[in-house]
UniProtKB/Swiss-Prot annotation:
Residues 811-860 form the UBA domain. GO terms for biological process: autophagy; defense response to fungus; protein transport. It comes from Solanum tuberosum (Potato). GO terms for cellular component: autophagosome; cytoplasmic vesicle. PANTHER family: OVARIAN CARCINOMA ANTIGEN CA125-RELATED (PTHR20930), PROTEIN JOKA2 (PTHR20930:SF6). Residues 325-345 have a biased composition (Polar residues). It is found in: Vacuole; Cytoplasmic vesicle, Autophagosome. Residues 6-90 form the PB1 domain. The lineage of its organism: Eukaryota, Viridiplantae, Streptophyta, Embryophyta, Tracheophyta. Autophagic substrate that functions as a host autophagy cargo receptor. Requires ATG8 protein expression to be recognized as an autophagic substrate. Activates ATG8CL-mediated selective autophagy, and contributes to defense against the fungal pathogen Phytophtora infestans. The ATG8 interacting motif (AIM) is required for the interaction with ATG8CL. The AIM motif is required for JOKA2 function as host autophagy cargo receptor. InterPro entries: Ig-like_fold, N_BRCA1_central, PB1-like, PB1_dom, UBA, UBA-like_sf, UBA_NBR1_C, Znf_ZZ. This is Protein JOKA2. Residues 92-117, 194-234, 295-345 are annotated as: Disordered.
Length: 862
């Protein structure tokens, strides 16, 4: 007993997915590969001869192509349910889909040079039966059955017959649907009107058919074969009967409507008789028979001269003989509103009705035949002029290349294809593979990697670095997903600019007027938007790193510039935003007049501060703010170093003269011009110290072991330029009550033999700076400062300080080469900040904070 089941087959073509069930008998699919293709062609309305490529996903997840029945059997062995198949039209068959063709046209858009005899016959018959009126449907079906059975080799005649029936049905259907007024037919089915006459009342011309002179054109027997005489006669007779019957029904139905025409009686004549061995070949440009009854509003056709030449630039094609032999072949040509026809041939005059027939949309008058041959052949074809230039792209699907414009059948001599017709095929929505990301740009945002502005496509915002963005290319090279946020679309603004011309980005961007370049980072503001802004110019006094004694009062002055596009209003303040609180005030109002500070003007801003009590490094951040509290512009800061040594009293008068020693300054003994005089005594008395002075002896004894290296003595300069708070102090020798005095030493002069005691006096002078307690305090202060900078290894810091003789700047440089700042410097280099010396200075200034260093570098670039 056969086991029956079913399998679900899902077929996808482009964006369309269809499914159907197929029977499975004894584990075999009840469809072969041919049946499967036919089913898919039916589902997606492909042309029956379309070439498909079918693929599916097998049990291993691979894409496999279905070629033959063995592949289907292999599918069944895999037990795939549902079976998912992807269909793809081959490159040459994408235009062969049935739904893309114009209705009623039996000729493909790309006509092959040799067509099968009964190509698309069934589809033609189906199209005809939809449009033929009900009284004729049975007769037509009978005629078609007889023709199919008796005329196996007369494919061209059957094709012509089916087209004639189709056009007749279309004409009936269109006239009935639109309610247009039809006119009574003139003539009979057996007679041919003679002469080229118009109606007596000046109305529309009668439509006539004359005899066409025989032409010696090459027969198309190579294409279709020699038709049988009996089949040809039978097909022609059936066609004539069918057309005559249609005319009778049309005349009976519209006879009572002809009285509505005033001034003239419109007359229309269809092709009503055909001689034997002749083809029914009066066609419009899209391959259909001309069987329309036109009604116009104005009885006066457009005036045309008899010697009218073909329109310049339009293609010209020769008539094609479709007869069975050269001797008997005759071709009917059609001429709309032609005043005269050549006496040697025949023409079909179609009345002008103010609009163009179906398939001839928006055409100027065109002579299809060559003007050189028009006189001899007597055949011409003119298309109605509708008062404006043609939209030629509408003819794209109507006139195929290398095809006769009358019948749609490929020609033998391959006439020149139209040159001025633009064959535009409207793109489907599924043909657009762009996801739209390439056309989106982030306005006002610059890539910090490559500098492109604006960033086009995805934007990557750094989580670690403030105001740091990358484009997709730079992110692929240097970024990682953990540190960045992807933003596919830009931020929306209250009044965004128009995106009307964003598609013109490729090579058609309008040049911007020259403006002052502004680096807008992060989310940024719109260019040209009114805003308050400020820029730091310089420190007027109290430079960064100034050493002060505890609790010293001082005033810091910054010079600021208004670099925005708004005037700073009166009431603008400098407010404290963070850091150490060195002032008892949180805001200081700027000295601005009622008119405000104009753009590009500078202003000195002063704030009173007090140094903290404890030693260390202190920094306070300030920023400008409007009267409403809105902060703007670059921030400024004050950076000081509090040293407790400057306020600790020492023994003797010698030490007071050396208070405020700045260990950060380089040695000052190399670039001295002229004699460097050290005046230790305010009132020098004796050259040598008195032996009764116990304080001096104690100092000399305590420093005797330390000052063995004389080079160390010279590396301690005396520079009071950065000292704050000790200008009012005097080193009077009477304060201590000691009669000891020291001489004035001229370092440029060579010591004489008489002054042999001067070196010992110099040792006594520098002794307080090198005592054990002083070294310990200096070392602890420098170690604390290094620890605040980020150098946590105390032993290494001590070693470096002692090696550099407590030179803080040199020690920091050495520590940067061997300690924790190497990764920070390397990271700054990767960000694009390659000035190593500048990076070191900023790291020292910002206590090793990479965030603050980056912000300072960005502010410096601006």
């Amino acid at each position: 007993m056969a086991m029956e089941s079913s399998i679900v087959i899902k077929v996808k073509y482009e964006e369309t997915l269809r499914r159907f069930n197929a029977c499975v008998i004894n584990e075999k699919l009840d469809l072969d590969i041919g049946g499967l293709r036919d089913k898919i062609i039916q589902l997606f309305n492909f042309a029956h001869d379309a070439e498909l490529t079918l693929t599916y996903i097998d049990e291993d997840g691979d894409v496999v192509t279905l070629v033959d029945d063995e592949d289907l059997q292999d599918v069944m062995r895999q037990d795939l349910n549902p079976l998912r198949i992807s269909a793809r039209l081959n490159a040459g068959e994408r235009s062969g889909r049935a739904s893309a063709r114009s209705s009623g046209n039996s000729t493909p858009l790309r006509s092959p040079r040799v067509q099968p005899p009964f190509l698309n016959l069934n589809s033609r018959v189906s199209d005809v039966l939809k449009y033929i009126p009900e009284p004729l449907r049975e007769s037509v079906m009978k005629v078609c059955s007889d023709m199919t059975a008796s005329a196996s080799s007369s494919a061209p005649i059957l094709a012509e017959l089916v087209d004639a029936m189709s056009e007749m049905g279309l004409s009936y259907y269109q006239n009935q649907a639109s309610g247009s007024q039809a006119v009574k037919e003139a003539g009979s089915c057996s007679g041919i009107s003679k002469g080229n006459t118009k109606s007596a009342d000046g109305g529309m011309p009668n439509v006539k058919i004359g005899e066409s002179s025989p032409k010696k054109n090459r027969p198309l027997t190579a294409l279709h074969g020699e038709p049988k005489p009996n089949a040809s006669n039978e097909a022609v007779d059936a066609s004539v009967k069918l057309v005559c019957k249609s005319e009778t029904l049309e005349g009976d139905r519209t006879e009572d409507l002809s009285s509505s025409f005033k001034g003239s009686k419109a007359q229309t004549s269809l092709v009503n008789s055909l001689e034997k061995d002749k083809k029914f070949d009066v066609r419009s440009l899209d391959g259909r028979t001309i069987g329309y009854a036109y009604v116009r509003n104005s009885p006066i056709p457009p005036e045309k001269t008899s010697d009218e030449q073909p329109s310049k630039g339009h293609p010209v094609a020769k008539p094609v003989d479709l007869g069975g032999s050269a001797s008997s072949s005759k071709v009917k040509q059609c001429n709309w509103d032609s005043p005269n026809a050549d006496s040697s041939g025949s023409s079909i005059n179609m009345p002008y009705d103010g609009f163009t027939p179906s398939g001839l949309v928006h055409l100027n008058t065109v002579n299809v035949n060559d003007s050189h041959n028009a006189g001899s052949s007597g055949s011409s074809m003119k298309m109605p002029y509708d008062g404006f230039r043609p939209a030629v792209r509408h003819l794209g699907p109507l006139i195929p290349v290398n095809a006769c414009p009358f019948s749609g059948v490929p020609t033998v001599n391959n006439p020149i294809p139209p040159q001025n017709f633009s064959f535009e095929v409207p793109l489907k929505r599924s043909h657009n593979h762009s996801d739209g990301t390439g056309t989106i740009f982030h306005k006002g945002v610059r890539c910090d990697g490559c500098g492109v502005h604006p960033i086009t496509g995805p934007r990557f915002i750094s989580k670690v670095k403030e105001n740091y963005d990358l484009c997709s290319i730079c992110f692929a090279e240097m970024g990682n997903d953990a540190d960045y946020i992807r933003m596919d679309r830009p931020l929306t603004y209250p009044n965004p600019w128009s995106f009307k011309s964003l598609h013109d980005l490729h090579g058609r961007l309008r040049p911007r007027p020259p403006t002052v370049p502004q680096v807008i980072r992060g989310f940024g503001l719109k260019a040209g938007r009114p805003k308050l802004d400020s820029r730091f110019i310089q420190d007027v006094n109290v430079l960064d790193g100034t050493i002060m004694a505890p609790l010293t009062r001082f005033t810091k002055i910054w010079r600021m510039k208004n670099n925005g596009n708004l005037v700073w209003p009166q009431g603008t303040q400098l407010v404290w935003i963070g850091g150490d609180k060195l002032s008892d005030r949180f805001s200081v109002e700027l000295e601005i007049t009622t008119a405000g500070l104009a753009v590009d003007q500078e202003l000195d801003v002063a704030v009173d501060f007090t140094a903290p009590e404890h030693p260390g490094r202190y920094i306070s951040y300030w920023r400008l703010a409007s009267a409403s509290g809105q902060k703007f512009g670059q921030r400024v800061w004050v950076l000081i170093q509090v040293d407790a040594l400057l306020s600790v009293p020492k023994k003797g008068l010698v030490h007071e003269a050396f208070q405020g020693l700045n260990l950060n300054l380089p040695p000052a003994g190399s670039g001295v011009s002229g004699p460097d005089i050290i005046n230790v005594n305010s009132e020098p008395q004796n050259v040598l110290p008195e032996p009764k002075s116990s304080s001096t002896m104690e100092l000399v004894d305590s420093v005797a072991e330390v000052n063995q290296n004389k080079e160390q003595e010279a590396k301690f300069p005396i520079n009071d330029s950065l000292l704050v708070g000790f200008g009012d102090k005097s080193s009077s020798p009477s304060a201590s009550g000691s009669p000891i005095s020291y001489p004035v030493i001229d370092l440029t002069e060579k010591p004489s033999a008489d002054s042999s005691m001067q070196p010992s006096a110099a040792v006594a002078m520098q002794a307080p700076l090198q005592d054990a307690r002083g070294n310990f305090e200096v070392e602890m202060s420098l170690l604390q400062e290094l620890e605040e900078m980020g150098f946590k290894q105390v032993d290494l810091n001590k070693e470096i300080l002692r090696k550099n003789e407590y030179d803080l700047e040199q020690s920091v440089d050495d520590l940067c080469g061997v300690a924790e700042w190497d990764p920070i410097l390397e990271e700054l280099k990767e960000m694009g900040f390659c000035d190593k010396e500048m990076n070191k200075k900023l790291l020292k200034k910002n206590n090793g904070s990479i965030k603050r260093v980056v912000m300072d570098l960005i502010a410096g670039e601006q």
